[in-house]
């Protein structure tokens, strides 16, 4: 059975000292779900964009990266609102899940 490839993505907020460890944990959670992390994708911001999680320019860079790698799934470090997930899925043309959904898949 072929593994699904994903991009693990997160926003590093200024006050987050454990960001690298959190991203490693996200990758481990993905692997526990049988996913293959093709790449990590990050952005440093003072706070997450309330509409789209990433800034608009960085979101378009993520879209380009998905196309280059032929990856159709993104997992996010932080819990997102349904509106953020919809905006990202519409912009990226990819399935987007947050950390909480990933954990629920492990225990399903």
Where does each model-flagged region fall?
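N-terminal accessory targeting/assembly segments
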Residues: 1-105
